[in-house]
A protein has these predicted regions:
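C-terminal GPI-anchoring signal of eukaryotic secretory precursors
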Residues: 520-542
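A post-motif C-terminal structural segment
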Residues: 33, 43-60, 72-77, 87-92, ...
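His/Cys-centered metal/cofactor-coordination and adjacent catalytic loops
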Residues: 148-164
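Short hydrophobic alpha-helical runs that function as membrane-insertion/retention elements
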Residues: 181-184
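Cleavable N-terminal signal peptides of Sec/SRP-targeted secreted and luminal proteins
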Residues: 2-18, 539-552
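N-terminal secretory/membrane-targeting segments
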Residues: 8-9, 13-74
Length: 556
């Protein structure tokens, strides 16, 4: 074994120069910046696409780049975990076109490693954000609507043994490894996805005590999500908490910072309780100026609640000219990273949700969904550009899909928000983007005659409030059951490959960061010294060296 390691080490030194570019976090190939990333622009098509040589050259360039890629085999000192809520493959593809062209790439699509994850719950084929959060954050599949409680417990139960049935995952393991931790979302911070980072509850809707007591349960024995954020094992140790949902922290008899009443029934102001629990070097902020004026050098804990409920959509912030008051997702990620990266000797774990993609799809408003996906991509680009590839693992995925399809046979350069074609049955137009179900049904078919479609060209399809075509009437469009993509970049990102169950992701992340069950041994997860891991590492390095030698022999 020593001889193998010596040979591999020698080879790695010889080829290190060829991989230097790959290991730099801001190199053009892996993380190139797009000129269209800051907003929509007209589609641009390279005239050279009309030649065969164009495509052959592009293929060869891609092959060459792939052969130059080498895995970063090292412990992930830092982890940034992004979840685009409801970000289906169709949503990603449509967002490329929204930003200018089919052959554009979102920031995370440029990551070198790609996997897919199966999203079903234990008791549902199509998942919600609660059971999926439990899977991709804590490593266990559970029942629809439940967060971090075992699937043997039924939803809404408040008679189970909490000690035997509840659990937490990645954020707890990170804290046990003395990493700084943070949760960022543009939903309510108590919503299902962010709650998966710190709470255990049998009903995702129990965001404050009023919902628990209305269900006939004792909120002192089965605490609500907001209470767990302030007083729970993981929540009380979070260094940075940014999102919406002030109402769940404020009593119904009090007004919040923007003069909106709270919804708690127990009379407790959890914002004040958080302040009391963090009397030194901590700050609470509720608007963008407060967020941007944080004294990063001296502050250790931040609680930011920027809305009574969910944050506004990006386009709503722009329309209402609230950019100076309401932070967008990229603003929050930037602020969180400034807090987390100030101690160069300490690792961190940042969990980020782009929540409004999902909400826009539920509303059957694809322009909002695509703009939220673009903002999500911008936040990831920011994170990758200001962190080092050799010590920061970034994983990007989604919790579930949606029923939106990207369909028809529109010509290149067509507006993704426009008409995709005309039916050869009724002669009427149909949109390139449409939904299998949702409120858009009522705009798609004539009232009183569901057999006859409406001429959809009469609608302003560029208006972000316009509902798009849907086949089945629902008051809210549903989730989709397809697999979701997983993108990875940084240390040990190469283990994110192939198709897997969604609950495998926490194992991969904790293995890369050496936290949780992989903290105390060599990383095999079997409680034994890591000899198997060392052998696998040697084999991987030998493969990398062999590919590099092959690359040097090829003629380009």
């Amino acid at each position: 074994m020593k001889a193998v390691i010596t040979v591999v080490t020698t080879l790695l030194v010889a080829v290190a120069a060829t991989n230097e570019v790959h290991r730099s976090y801001d190199n053009d190939h892996q993380h190139q910046r797009s000129s269209s990333i800051n907003g929509r622009q007209a589609a641009t098509i390279d005239p050279a696409e009309a030649t065969s040589d164009f495509w052959r050259q592009k293929a060869q360039e891609t092959l060459k780049a792939k052969l130059q890629e080498a895995p970063v085999i090292a412990k992930a000192k830092n982890v940034i975990y992004f979840i685009g809520d409801g970000m289906s493959a169709q949503t990603i593809a449509a967002t490329r076109m929204y930003l200018g062209n089919e052959n554009k790439m979102l920031s995370f699509e440029q990551f070198p490693y790609l996997a897919t994850a199966k999203t079903y719950c234990v008791n549902r084929q199509v998942a919600d954000s609660a059971c999926t959060a439990t899977a991709y954050l804590s490593g266990v599949k559970t029942n629809y609507g439940m967060i971090n409680v075992g699937p043997h417990v039924p939803r809404y139960s408040c008679t189970y043994n909490r000690t035997e049935s509840e659990f937490l995952g990645l954020l707890k393991w990170a804290q046990e490894a003395d990493m700084a931790t943070a949760v960022v979302t543009n939903a309510r911070i108590t919503h299902a996805t962010p709650a998966g980072a710190y709470a255990s509850i049998t009903n995702r809707d129990w965001e404050d005590d009023s919902y628990v007591t209305n269900a006939g349960c004792d909120a002192t024995k089965y605490p609500d999500v907001a209470h767990q954020l302030v007083h729970g094992e993981v929540g009380k140790r979070l260094n940075v908490i940014l999102g919406g949902g002030r109402r769940h922290f404020v009593p119904s008899t009090q007004m919040d910072d923007e003069n909106v009443a709270g919804s708690r029934a127990d009379g407790r102001n959890l914002i004040n309780e958080w302040k009391e629990a963090h009397p030194n070097n901590a700050t609470y902020v509720w608007n963008k100026s407060g967020l941007q004026s944080i004294d990063v050098t001296n502050i250790e804990n931040v609680l930011g609640l920027f809305d009574s409920s969910h944050s506004l959509y990006n386009l709503e912030i722009d329309d209402q000219r609230l950019g100076a008051v309401k932070p967008k997702l990229t603003d929050m990620v930037d602020a969180a990273l400034k807090m987390l990266t100030k101690d160069k000797d300490k690792g961190y774990f940042l969990f980020v949700e782009g929540a409004k993609i999902d909400m826009a799809h539920h509303d059957s408003r694809p322009r909002l969904a695509l703009e939220e996906t673009a903002e999500f991509s911008r936040a990831i680009e920011l994170a990758r550009n200001i962190t080092a590839l050799d010590d920061t693992l970034i994983v990007v995925s989604s919790d579930h899909g949606h029923t939106m399809t990207y369909n028809g046979y529109p010509k290149r350069g067509s507006d993704i928000l426009g008409i995709g074609g005309y039916s050869d049955e009724d002669g009427l137009p149909y949109t390139t983007l449409s939904y299998a179900n949702g409120e858009g049904y009522y705009l798609t078919y004539k009232e009183g005659n569901p057999a006859e479609r409406v001429d959809f060209s009469q609608y302003d399809l560029t208006d972000h409030q316009t509902l798009y075509m849907a086949t089945v009437p629902l008051n809210a469009e549903s989730h989709g059951g397809e697999d979701v993509a997983v993108f990875a970049s940084g240390p040990m990102a190469h283990i994110f490959r192939g198709n897997m169950e969604q609950n495998v992701l926490p194992d991969l992340i904790s293995y890369a960061a050496k936290i949780g069950k992989y903290k105390e041994n060599g990383g095999d997860g079997d409680g034994q010294p890591g000899s198997g891991s060392s052998l696998a590492l040697c084999i991987q390095l030998m493969v990398v060296c062999g590919v590099t030698v092959l690359l040097g022999q090829l003629k380009w």
